[in-house]
């Protein structure tokens, strides 16, 4: 486990992954209120962007209530201690977007790719380092490749300049042994100076447990969000994770009661669809489907009179990955044709 004398680095993602839960509709006032509460409670960083990262606001992913820069500027002007982070997916966001985010106040960037496509992150990681940003590699859908193969992708990101590399369980499909194996593999090949992080989703109710297992296997940074606000069944709930590690005697530097109050009083009332494990979100973890497919799949199921659970299982069977949201409708239409032909 991470040395108990070392503080766990807590990266909050309520204002980025949490965007998925409300279709990217945070008001600036809500963003400021959440950021202020997180800053007061003691988190290390607050990630801010459209749910699909810089420039994610689009027909394919959903249009945001505000621009990334408006959200980032609002949060950067609010926090006194926490650093502002953002997310960039090569192919959606560009280095020009990254520069604009930096100018707006972001000082940390997570460059996110599918777990087997680290090679497309080279330009963005290098540019982030030129800007002097804390530069993080973010390997999404980490359940879809082996621990050793994932470690080699992490090594690529490190070679480009990433100072930290994340195991990202985008589908909430990893078990505790899976997490342990991946961190052991990363630690075996990465330079000791390169940190590692865990981004969990709660689709199998393992978000907190997997994050603790990651710590036991050398993880340095943990992503979490208030009430678990995030795609699918959400992320590891920040207030729950901090309470759990507090009972384990680990140093986290946060005020547990303030986090609980922020979760219940500020964030939970914003949920238009409860962020929880239910039939549809469990299907994501069971089938290993990208968590942000949830709302898109539910919309397709309602439109075509199909089961969202069945669509998700088929998406998992076809091994769809982030960025293939347009295929959800294709899968639904294929299922509709098959039903009509039966």
From Swiss-Prot:
GO biological process, alphabetically ordered: catabolic process; L-leucine biosynthetic process
EC number: 4.1.3.39
UniProt-annotated catalytic positions: 20 (proton acceptor)
CDD domains: DRE_TIM_HOA
Site note Transition state stabilizer, residues: 16
One GO MF term: 2-isopropylmalate synthase activity
Chain sites annotated for binding substrate: 16-17, 170, 199, 290
Alphabetical keyword list: Aromatic hydrocarbons catabolism, Lyase, Manganese, Metal-binding
Pyruvate carboxyltransferase domain boundaries: 8-260
Catalytic activity: (S)-4-hydroxy-2-oxopentanoate = acetaldehyde + pyruvate
UniProt entry tagged with the keyword Manganese: yes
Record: residues binding Mn(2+): 17, 199, 201
EC class: lyase
Family: Belongs to the 4-hydroxy-2-oxovalerate aldolase family.
Protein name as catalogued: 4-hydroxy-2-oxovalerate aldolase 4
Organism: Burkholderia lata (strain ATCC 17760 / DSM 23089 / LMG 22485 / NCIMB 9086 / R18194 / 383)
